[in-house]
Amino acid sequence: MEKILVIRNDKLGDFMQAWPAFAMLKASNPKLKLTALVPSYTASLAEICPFIDHVIIDSKKNDKTDFKRLVQEIKAQQFDGMISFFSNTHNGKLAWKSGIKYRLAPATKWVQILYNHRLTQRRSRSEKSEAEYNQDLVRTFLQKHNMPVVEPKPPYLIFEKSAVENQRVFLQENLGLSANKKWIFVHSGSGGSATNLSLAQYADLIKGLLAEFDCNVVLTAGPGESEKAYELANLVNDLRVAIYDKNKGLVDFAHSLACADLFIAGSTGPLHLSSAFNIPTIGFYPNSRSSQPRRWKPINDVDKHIAFCPPAGKESQMNLELISIDNALAEISLFIRNMWQTSNNI
């Protein structure tokens, strides 16, 4: 058992939640060769993942010709095994048609019959985080093949020091940031997959932080989110706020996130990407069972993340406007001071 296909072909945040599982595979058996099946959107990140050796681009949705291309590409690699961290009809058919002898996936829905090894997880109960569910699959794989289980630790992504320093200089020059201040990155967009605070709430949060900490706040924005970032900047109306809405792709964006001293967002891809660097993070979540903080906590150290959500209950669980920013600021202020350790630079 050496050549393994690992599948996490959904969104950015979901993909990042699989990195500890990739790390566990490599740490437990460095001889394993991991090939990741990912969509084109996250392929560039997969290529810089230190635990992934090769990348295969997933087929286009509902494109039968491209699906056949993908099946042939996988067959040609002659994998010894596969782990699908995310199972749907597409992945199930792919597993079956690829002819890989060892096929492991969560035991969910009818598609589980297309895998010959399954792990009952009941993820819908959200008793663990997505990253922990992914690692449980890896533990099952390792134990089945008599390989020792080595638990991974963050950070899961480290850039060369010079690369981060160069990116800091670039951001200083282009965004007008101070080299002597801490940098708080705030992502107010939702990416289409998660509810988030209102712009008014984010403005109150940022104003509260700037009143206590003399830092720079960088407003990040993904495709189609620039207008909201500018609106938020106008609401805050502080010269220490800058907008970062242009980059050269996910890898370039990741280099900028590596420069942050703190990252604040809803439960979105950028939150999970930033946590791979083990920088402090603050998240705002819905309180439904499938979206709550426990299920989608990021992959940095436990003590480097705090989360807020609205009260439980059908009428309130999805309404993040019920989160009190004044109450959150008290906890956030203490968290920041603990993370930054000293008041000399704030």
Curated annotation (Swiss-Prot):
It is an enzyme of class 2 (transferase). Its EC number is 2.-.-.-. Pfam families: Glyco_transf_9. One of its GO terms (biological process) is lipopolysaccharide core region biosynthetic process. CDD domains: GT9_LPS_heptosyltransferase. Belongs to the glycosyltransferase 9 family. This is Putative glycosyltransferase HI_0523. It comes from Haemophilus influenzae (strain ATCC 51907 / DSM 11121 / KW20 / Rd). The lineage of its organism: Bacteria, Pseudomonadati, Pseudomonadota, Gammaproteobacteria, Pasteurellales.
